Amino acid sequence: MSLPVKRMGVLGGAFDPPHLAHLALAQAAIAQLKLDELRVLPTGQAWHKTRKLSLAEHRLAMTKLAFADVPKVVVDEREIRREGATYTVDTLRELRAENPGAELFLVLGEDQARVFGTWHEFEAIAQIAIICVAARAILTNDEATSGTQNASSSDPMPNHFHPLKMPNMPVSATLIRARIADHQDILPLVTEPVARYIANYHLFETT
């Protein structure tokens, strides 16, 4: 009798800071894809980010706090520890080698799906993992027209996307950082431990 195939999700991001939409996406992926485990990976040196990220130690700590109570989530530090540019394809290859026979599911948020065609070796990513995207990112094509290459219906890649049903959550790290800079409350957007960490370390403050 053969053992069941392990179903492993992979959710990466800057998590600068992690917020409630990240948690909702993780919980949706675990439930809808019937995952045995979801690896959450804060990025290291993000080649595609024009904005300088917060220190890796802060983003890692906030990510651990944010996902601490989500069953089946494992915060994976490998991209933070990796020297040089961080590429998702390298992480997927490592996970495949470490978990032979496992089925990999790459979980993307709306913003990531829009520019998936610009990712390093995106064709190889699609061969290694099943790409799963928050439904709004692949159903609202008029919103997916920004960027150098997007995930609209004219792009062949969305044919390989598996939709995840997600509530409409107008939350973003950009909005949270702006609220902090404007001395506004962020508790409706992040968990209490993350809000406390941000306050304790005075992250994202402009003055």
Where are these regions (language model features)?
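Nucleotidyltransferase catalytic core that binds NTPs
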Residues: M1-T207
